[in-house]
Amino acid sequence: MNSWFSGFKKEKIKLEDNKFGEVDITFRHGGKGEPLLLLHGNPMSHVTWHKIVDELKSKFYVVTSDLRGYGESIGPEEGGPNHINYSFRAMADDQIRLMDKLGFKEFKVVGHDRGARTAHRMCLDFPTKVKKVAIFDIMPNRH
């Protein structure tokens, strides 16, 4: 699997002091250029992007992470009232905090399926952070 992400660094980051519970996010990052966040669908992980990251890394600084509760990322044991700790809002908050920790104040996002719903929520909750967004395999809804 490492050959799929040549030139990328794999890391895990703990996001604490969060209204949605503590979470460990696993992600890979690398490349050069504008920051681009890739968000996977259900029931996948960041590895779903392995066929395109090599092409993207020459034009973008690519970040591809596992959403909370997917892949190697670990979310809180308790889902909270109405499963708020695993909501799109919680996942959007995670990704914004991850990108902040990497030093990116604004960035582009591509999301598929559950990742697309998370990207849509990011646009609603953090409109100054998301420069452009591409979402596919969803119809945005009230979430």
Could you describe each region identified by the protein language model?
Residues 1-35, 58-60, 85-86:
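Alpha/beta-hydrolase fold catalytic core
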Residues 3-7, 44, 87-94, 114:
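Soluble or luminal CAZymes and related metallo-dependent hydrolases
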Residues 19-20, 28, 67-111, 140:
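Active-site loop/oxyanion-hole signature of alpha/beta-hydrolase fold enzymes
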Residues 26-76, 84:
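Conserved HGGG/HGGXW glycine-rich cap/lid loop of the alpha/beta-hydrolase fold
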Residues 50, 96, 120-124:
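Short, hydrophobic alpha-helix immediately C-terminal to the catalytic nucleophile
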